[in-house]
Amino acid sequence: MAIRKFKPYTPGTRQRVVTDFSEITGSKPERSLIVSKHRNKGRNNRGVITCRHRGGGHKRQYRLVDFRRDKKNINAKVAAIHYDPHRNARLALLFYEDGEKRYIIAPAGIKVGQNVISGEGVPIEEGNAMPLSSMPLGSNVHCVELYAGRGAQMVRSAGASAQLMAKEGEYVALKLPSTEVRLVRKECYATLGEVGNSEIRNTSLGKAGRRRWLGRRPQVRGSVMNPCDHPHGGGEGKAPIGRAGPVTPWGKAALGLKTRKKNKPSNKLVVRRRRRISKRSRGGRDS
């Protein structure tokens, strides 16, 4: 997989950088594995906006992805690599020996015709799913379960991987992409290797319209609003916000405020917190 740059024929193509989609082999999704999904456009059940800057975009159908990998000790062949409009990672279509078809998150380097399997005692190969206790130290893994049998909940985005750092008692230590070191029970399943399509981080949309196609609406800076609309608003010209630090439209501290509860039971499983990104390197926008 590689990235594709465009010549500056138009303002939209001047900054545009996209993936070349060379790894995708299937043009149409598996009919039995797609369902319609209601798009709430950032609204809750009462129609009130709870997540701003959402709405519009191209119509999508949801692909049913197997995050549990619960077909144990049954060989599956990779039939195709498909595009998924709901995530940056690609999907691998598996044909199992018993005739069942399933989608999984495509690991980096997986090829059509390759065999994968899940279960205890399976070969240590990329794409195979097994308990964390069966993996050698230093392994890169993705699609990690937090609770055994619940399905993968961590390390699922394109190019992501966690590293198996240590095994001690009933737990193993994983270094997550955020650099946080967390304990996970050893019977939880994970998939060997990293998620494919890592070059997505080097892409650029190039124009506002492509962002609208993805269902993202414009973000208006609070400093250009009126005082009745945002705490940063008002003043003459480009006035400062008049506060010690930036706040949300509802007056709560933004950019750096910890949102994790101090008394959360799973805090004891976090060995080392993720590194804190400075405001300068974060490059965040005015809320």
Swiss-Prot record:
Alphabetic keyword roster: Ribonucleoprotein, Ribosomal protein, RNA-binding, rRNA-binding
GO biological process, one term: translation
Record has Ribonucleoprotein as a keyword: yes
Any matching Pfam family: Ribosomal_L2_C
Region Disordered, annotated ranges: 221-287
Biased composition (Basic residues): 258-287
InterPro entries in UniProt: NA-bd_OB-fold (IPR012340), Rib_uL2_dom2 (IPR014722), Ribosomal_uL2 (IPR002171), Ribosomal_uL2_bac/org-type (IPR005880), Ribosomal_uL2_C (IPR022669), Ribosomal_uL2_CS (IPR022671), Ribosomal_uL2_dom3 (IPR014726), Ribosomal_uL2_RNA-bd_dom (IPR022666)
Keyword Transferase assigned: no
GO molecular function: rRNA binding; structural constituent of ribosome; transferase activity
GO CC, any one term: large ribosomal subunit
SMART domains per UniProt: Ribosomal_L2, Ribosomal_L2_C
Family: Belongs to the universal ribosomal protein uL2 family.
Cited function: One of the primary rRNA binding proteins. Required for association of the 30S and 50S subunits to form the 70S ribosome, for tRNA binding and peptide bond formation. It has been suggested to have peptidyltransferase activity; this is somewhat controversial. Makes several contacts with the 16S rRNA in the 70S ribosome.
Subunit details: Part of the 50S ribosomal subunit. Forms a bridge to the 30S subunit in the 70S ribosome.
Name recorded for this polypeptide: Large ribosomal subunit protein uL2
Organism, as annotated: Prochlorococcus marinus subsp. pastoris (strain CCMP1986 / NIES-2087 / MED4)
Gene: rplB
